[in-house]
From Swiss-Prot:
It catalyses: 2 glutathione + H2O2 = glutathione disulfide + 2 H2O. This is Glutathione peroxidase 7. GO terms for molecular function: glutathione peroxidase activity; peroxidase activity. Its main location: secreted. Keywords: Oxidoreductase, Peroxidase, Secreted, Signal. Transmembrane segments: none annotated. It comes from Bos taurus (Bovine). The gene is GPX7. Residues 1-18 form the signal peptide. Belongs to the glutathione peroxidase family. GO terms for biological process: response to oxidative stress. It is found in: Secreted. It comes from the Eukaryota.
């Protein structure tokens, strides 16, 4: 009997100590102003992670739609997380300060922006490596969008030809589900 209890306690202890599977919110990134940020701060929220560029043909359409999405859903545990990238057509050549100024001045963006990074290849930021590996979809141009659930798991990935408006119903459904869960928890 004592041996059985000891074995049960060992199994419980082993399960409690088992490493948790890595997710998007386990990473850190430098924000647009140079401060290291743990993406953990977004855990519990729905995130739309996007590689952005200031001089792309998709810039105007996407920045406007992303800001509208942030405005509409931001108060409800949602964030657009923008990562400038200069890998595709050299369409993000400016400094972080200039990128932020452009986005805020031209589109009044209120969503979090991060420092310019690589999103593909050997120098890709670890968070984007995770997005690529778990979704099976690697960015091939600017404005790839990855929908991340409150638990950090990737729900979907879309290329820039898919508009924010087209995926808005999926985003809204995920936010609605989160709101209902939070109400249940009260």
């Amino acid at each position: 009997m004592v041996a059985a209890r000891a074995a049960a306690w060992l199994l419980l202890a082993a399960a409690a100590c088992a490493p948790r599977e890595q997710d998007f919110y386990d990473f850190k990134a430098v924000n647009i102003r140079g401060k290291l940020v743990s993406l953990e701060k977004y855990r519990g929220s729905v995130s739309l992670v996007v590689n952005v560029a200031s001089e792309c043909g998709f810039t105007d359409q996407h920045y406007r739609a992303l800001q509208q999405l942030q405005r509409d859903l931001g108060p409800h545990h949602f964030n657009v997380l923008a990562f400038p990238c200069n890998q595709f057509g050299q369409q993000e050549p400016d400094s972080n300060k200039e990128i932020e100024s452009f986005a805020r001045r031209t589109y009044s963006v209120s969503f979090p922006m991060f420092s310019k990074i690589a999103v593909t290849g050997t120098g890709a930021h670890p968070a984007f490596k995770y997005l690529t590996e778990t979704s099976g979809k690697e960015p091939t141009w600017n404005f790839w969008k990855y929908l991340v659930a409150p638990d950090g798991k990737v729900i979907g990935a879309w290329d820039p030809t898919v508009s924010v408006e087209e995926i808005r119903p999926q985003i809204t459904a995920l936010v609605r589900k989160l709101i209902l869960k939070k109400r249940e928890d009260l």
